[in-house]
Amino acid sequence: MSEPFGIVAGALNVAGLFNNCVDCFEYVQLGRPFGRDYERCQLRLDIAKARLSRWGEAVKINDDPRFHSDAPTDKSVQLAKSIVEEILLLFESAQKTSKRYELVADQQDLVVFEDKDMKPIGRALHRRLNDLVSRRQKQTSLAKKTAWALYDGKSLEKIVDQVARFVDELEKAFPIEAVCHKLAEIEIEEVEDEASLTILKDAAGGIDAAMSDAAAQKIDAIVGRNSAKDIRTEERARVQLGNVVTAAALHGGIRISDQTTNSVETVVGKGESRVLIGNEYGGKGFWDN
């Protein structure tokens, strides 16, 4: 964010500040020190942005005249403005921390990840969430911003955790809980494969209960197609109830939209036997030695 916060905040109403706030996510890149955690961390950043955007959609921030007043009298709108300003300051502080790191870090540690570095499923979710937020943004940011990078997980978690807490406050200030949950369901209605839903549910943990719950419900609907009334095992026998999605499937970008039903009355496993009531996707998994 190259424009000083005070200049941006003083020139915009609540709706303008909010749109600038959502735009801030677009300019954050993740550095190579994130390593294998890059994909999950990127999705957590995407989900935090989507949740903030969802609140704006729920209160109709770009259409409600209360949010376009330069001097709002509504107490809830005043509170919203204060919270959005705090989020902008959060990004400004994180950017300053990154700039200090860049002064002392080795050049190799300043390389950033790109979308192409994500696995196919993660990349598809990343793009889906970005497209969703872009459709909601109806105002162009007035602030001139440049891309900048985060280089450690603690800084990222500080942002997503604090944004989540700020959105908690925004949601409490306006009676929109039911609307937010419905919007979260709509956000993932086109995500039908179990692997993508599982990744979303994990990435949303602790920062977006509505999305996590919506993903969990869709997963349960898929898993619920596999059932057994009576399962008995002896010795080292193993029984898996539900689909198995292996690491090979996740890394290979296999899209799993499961519509099959697997149902048995009784399973008796003995010795070294292994029974799967469900489907397996990918290479070795449940059946590995």
Swiss-Prot record:
Q: Where is this region: Globular domain?
A: 1-227
InterPro entries given in the database record: HeLo_dom, HeLo_sf, Het-s_prion_dom
> Where is the protein situated, by its record's location annotation?
Cytoplasm
Instruction: Check the record and name the Pfam families matching this protein.
Output: HeLo (PF14479), HET-s_218-289 (PF11558)
Q: Source organism's superkingdom?
A: Eukaryota
User: What outcome follows a substitution of P33H?
Assistant: Converts its specificity to [Het-S]
GO MF, one term, reads:
identical protein binding
**Prion domain (PrD), as annotated region:** 218-289
- Share the domain note from the entry: The globular domain is dispensable for prion formation and incompatibility function. However, the het-S globular domain, but not the het-s globular domain, is essential for programmed cell death. The prion domain (PrD) is unstructured in its native, soluble form, and forms a form a beta solenoid with a hydrophobic core in its amyloid form. It is both necessary and sufficient for amyloid formation and prion propagation.
Q: What else is known?
A: [Het-s] is the prion form of het-s. [Het-s] is the result of a conformational change of the cellular het-s protein that becomes self-propagating and infectious. This conformational change generates a form of het-S that assembles into amyloid fibrils. [Het-s] is transmitted as a non-Mendelian cytoplasmic element. On vegetative cell fusion with neutral [Het-s*] strains, the prion spreads throughout the cellular network and converts the non-prion form of het-s to a prion state, making the strains acquire the [het-s] phenotype. Interacts with het-S to trigger incompatibility. In P.anserina, the het-s locus exists as 2 incompatible alleles, het-s and het-S. Strains of het-s genotype (e.g. A, C, s, and V) can display 2 distinct phenoypes, the neutral (prion-free) [Het-s*], which is compatible with het-S strains (e.g. D, S, U, and X), and the reactive [Het-s] phenotype, which causes rapid cell death in het-S strains. Although the two alleles het-s and het-S differ from each other by 14 amino acids, vegetative incompatibility between s and S strains can be attributed to a single amino acid difference in the proteins encoded by the het-s locus.
What this chain does, per the entry, is described as: Responsible for heterokaryon incompatibility, a process that ensures that during spontaneous, vegetative cell fusion only compatible cells from the same colony survive (non-self-recognition). Forms a prion for the non-Mendelian trait [het-s]. Interacts with het-S from incompatible cells to trigger a lethal reaction that prevents the formation of viable heterokaryons. It is unknown if the native, soluble protein has a cellular function.
Assembly description: Homodimer. Forms heterodimers with het-S.
Q: What is this protein called?
A: Heterokaryon incompatibility protein s
Organism of provenance: Podospora anserina
